Swiss-Prot record:
The protein's name: Protein phosphatase 1 regulatory subunit 7
Keyword Repeat: yes
PANTHER family (UniProt xref): PROTEIN PHOSPHATASE 1 REGULATORY SUBUNIT 7, PROTEIN PHOSPHATASE 1 REGULATORY SUBUNIT SDS22-RELATED
Species of origin: Danio rerio
Record's keyword annotation contains Kinase: no
Length: 345
């Protein structure tokens, strides 16, 4: 294992509901109510730190899982001895450029989360790579990934990417995380037929479109964007989780073919009526808080979801009713959690 006499890395846990939980390792899973990153907990590189010389780091040629987290590394070099490495984590360093990885042909996972990288480059030798995380960097474009045909998970969260492009060769891709960027249009995803999870929270997207080819998609998160209409989801027949909170949606519609939905998050929009979802019989979680629901009869739309367990309706006009919780319990007897509180029996 690579070792260096520095302080232990700080663990981060950002509550990130609906966003990708897998960027990076299992110990730093990220979730957030609206797809935004908590400024108090988000990772941050500290440019005033002086980079260390890689010569001071001891590398074990036999090591398969190499951990070089928070080591103040300024340049990728000296890793050619790690011919057996399957995973390398270089997160929370001071790296400005991806380079000197040509010898790591057996690498399966590369973690460059929270550095100062401006360009995706010099990855062509990593043809066995299955997971790449370059979140929390300074990327402006998706590029340089053509040879990574085996990549299943790609995390580019919190960069400065303006458009979805150059992903055509990633036909094995199952998870794509592009949250917290500058994307305005959903596009160029047609070739990603294996994609199962797509995260686009906290961008500048105005329309749900160009998703027709994603037949295997089970999770779609487009929270904190500028969407005003529920549309373009008719071909996503395998969708199980849909996160659309913090947009400008006014009408519940367009979900006729999404019969497998188990989680529907449409909180913090402009919806006045719960409608057009009585066919969602597999629904287990329904998030409708921070809207404009005022009619108790609307809950009839949820009665066919016999396994419904969680309902969020707080900060709607309904909540002003003194019998708020009791009426929800009577209308939806299967529910075990109302807003943030579990029901006591």
């Amino acid at each position: 294992m690579a070792t260096l006499s520095v302080g232990e890395p700080q663990e981060m846990e950002v509550d990130r509901r609906g966003e990708s939980e897998e960027s990076g390792d299992d110990e730093t899973k990220r979730k957030s109510l609206n797809g935004e990153v908590d400024s108090l907990q988000a990772p941050s590189t500290v440019p005033e730190e002086s980079p260390v010389d890689m010569d001071t780091i001891t590398l074990d040629p036999e090591e398969e899982d190499v951990d070089l987290v928070h080591c103040r590394i300024g340049k990728i070099e000296g890793l050619e001895v790690l011919l057996k490495a399957k995973t390398i984590s270089l997160r929370q360093n001071l790296i400005k450029r991806i380079e000197n990885l040509e010898s790591l042909v057996s690498l399966r996972e590369l973690d460059l989360y929270d550095n100062q990288i401006r360009k995706l480059e010099n990855l062509q030798a990593l043809t066995e790579l299955e997971q790449l995380d370059v979140s929390f960097n300074l990327l402006r474009k998706i590029e340089g990934l053509d040879s990574l045909t085996k990549v299943k998970k790609l995390f580019l969260l919190h960069n400065k990417i303006a458009s979805i492009a150059n992903l055509d060769h990633l036909t094995s891709l199952q998870m794509l995380e592009l949250g917290s960027n500058r994307i305005r249009v959903i596009e160029n995803l047609d070739s990603l037929s294996s994609l199962e999870s797509l995260f686009l929270g906290t961008n500048k997207i105005t329309q749900l479109q160009n998703l027709d080819g994603l037949h295997n998609l089970t999770v779609l998160s487009i929270q904190s964007n500028r969407i005003t209409k529920l549309e373009g989801l008719q071909n996503l027949v395998n969708l199980r989780e849909l996160y659309l909170s913090h947009n400008g949606i006014e009408v519940m519609e367009g979900l006729e073919n999404n019969k497998k939905l188990s989680t529907l998050d449409i909180a913090a929009n402009r919806i006045k009526k719960i409608e057009n979802i009585s066919h969602l019989t597999d629904l287990k979680e329904f998030w409708m808080n921070d809207n404009q629901i005022e009619n108790w009869a609307d809950l009839d739309e949820l009665k066919n979801a016999k396994g419904l367990e969680t309902v969020y309706l707080e900060r709607n006009p309904l909540q002003k009713d003194p019998q708020y919780r009791r009426k929800i319990m009577l209308a939806l007897p299967s529910v075990r959690q109302i807003d943030a509180t579990f029901i006591r029996f």
